Amino acid sequence: MKKWCLLLLGLLPVTAWTQETTSLRGVQVTAQRRLTDTGLQKSSLDSTILHDHIASSLADILTRHSTLFIKSYGRATESTAEFRGTSPSHTQVTWNGMRINSPMLGTVDFSTIPSYFIDQATLYHGASSMHLTGGGLGGAVELKSLVPNISGHLLQYVQGIGSYSTYDQFLQFSHNGPKWSSNTRLVYSTSKNDFSYINHDKKVDVRDEQGNIVHSYHPKERNQSGYFTDIHALQDIFYNDGAGNRMGLSVWYAHHKRGLPFLSVDYKDDTDFTNEQDQNTLRSVLSWTHTESQWKSTVRGGYAYQDIAYDYHTTRQGIKNDITQSQSHTHNGYLQAEADYLPHEKWMLNAKAEAYYNKVRSHDKSPFLQHENYNKGRMEYHGSLQARWRPVSPFSVAAIIREEIYGKKWIPVMPALFADYVLYAPWKLVAKASVARNYRYPSMNDLYFKPGGNPDLEPEKGFTYDAGVEWDIRSKAFQLKGSFSAFDSYIKDWILWTPNTKGYWQPSNVKKVHNYGTEIMLEAATQIRKHARASLTANYAFTPSINQGKPSNDNDASYGKQLCYVPKHSANISARLEWKTWALQYKWIHYSERFTTTSNESDYITGQLKPYFMSDMAIEKAFRWKRLDASVKAVVNNLLDTDYVTVLSRPMAGRNFEIFIQLRPLWKQKRQAF
């Protein structure tokens, strides 16, 4: 404790940025902005992409506009992100500065985050995640709410209607004044989600009068128990006194009621079985920022609460028979202090101290357990020091030292080094390189879940090396922006849940994994004519993720094989053509084969998931009147009606349609562009 107090005292004079970037006064502004990104491999998603249409979750946006692999089996189903072939728990996520990874699972379900609620998303790849937080062995995602980009008031309503009795509604009211700003957003979505599909996991035999099989076919079935209702409410309030002080408050409530779809190999009738999950989440962050000529400091505090109830029962002859019931409650408290100091235009110093308190209570009723699962609390302390230096104009270096404490256990020091060099200034052509050591501490379920939790687990350890180039070429009517990066990562003591001899699953440190590969990101835009514009974004990732751990027994054939559900190749393209008040958009994604077994068995039908290509198309028309802006947008998902699966025995929807109507009343204030 004495050691931690000394570390905390050394970091207390410092705190973090507010929701949007605030410039420091004087010459330091230019230097600080250039130095901040020294050596970082990152990509950003702005509001144009995030606010594409109201039916999109952040999982949909990341699937179509990033190199991340989103493991999901449809809308309103659990959607986790995998950076560079790592585990979903290796992706750390913050919202307005507060980490929102589940303390139980260590992951984030991106399907529960409406993209309309996020104003800016930044992805930190590999070692660059150390700039934001620890534990991101694959990377980190930073989500922010920003001051509304309007002058005066904005009222917006969006109504969406789609296939499978799907309805989406979005309401926003924003105000931006000289000192006070407010942004209120509401989302309501509901759907039966009962799409039909050809079940390739079942076969029906047709017999003649003698009982001989004449032919067989795969039956057409409906997605059972896939219904959902999602409700979200977000309130952001910002205050700027004009004298260097800013305050922000963000409060977000969400309710989800979701049926859990039956497997395609399931023969049960959904009228007899109920399989659903109810979830309530509350998140809040309060921040205060003070800016002077060479200092910028922020103090943040936050609280998050979540309860999840899972119910699986049968109802026969009016009698309910419980099979499994589980409920969990989590409480998270958060405090942060951070500051940046610019002693000279060539130097930038940063320090940060954070404290989290996680409380988890889990209760299960199942064949294995009939009472409280576990009830645990844990303190976490995080501290970091960062220094950035530009000795000569084209060259910059940065160093980060991070330390974390979980309960009474200290994580070894996590260092990171970054460097970049400007190769050609007119094109903003920059070479970047970095190396970092990172650790991730086990989640609460890893340690305490009953049955199976393992309190003796060691933290996962990773070394990551990154190198690449980025560029931004611009002319009067054309822009080409992009990056190419190569990475090499080694993760030891990978935590893996495996079945034991007692009939349940248990985690252990069993794997050594080698992740390596390349990432390519491109953005292009051109002004064709006065009223015509074309743009394109493209992403590609090559991510071998190889198990190099010792075989657990003589029959273990997993050594040297690709990890389960990790595609080696993934790519996406988004093209948009605008002409006057019309817009046409096309999106394309591809994933290579994914193995479902650690031994990569391809001889079995269930041993691998076939590669697939997916296309979406949308057309939009904007209308502008004196007192109203409006638009109508029609979307075709799965344009080519591709038959595919992303998770074994989880069918996906075929071609389906959505239409959105957006209305924006206008006041005398300056209108916001569409």
Predicted regions and their residues:
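A beta-strand signature from Gram-negative outer-membrane beta-barrel systems
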Residues: S115-Q156
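Gram-negative outer-membrane beta-barrel transporters
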Residues: P391-S396, S485-Y490, N509-T598, D629, ...
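Membrane-embedded beta-barrel scaffold of Gram-negative outer-membrane proteins
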Residues: Q294-Y312, V360, Y424, A431-K432, ...
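Short acidic/polar hinge/loop motifs at secondary-structure boundaries
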Residues: M98-G126, P451
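N-terminal periplasmic "start-of-domain" segments of outer-membrane beta-barrel proteins
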Residues: L24-H53, T80, P88
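Extracytoplasmic beta-strand/coil segments of soluble accessory domains associated
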Residues: A59-S102
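Surface-exposed extracellular loop regions of Gram-negative outer-membrane beta-barrel proteins
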Residues: K257, D307-A309, G407-V413, A419-D466, ...
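Periplasmic-side early beta-strands and strand-to-turn transitions of outer-membrane beta-barrels
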Residues: S151, H175-N275
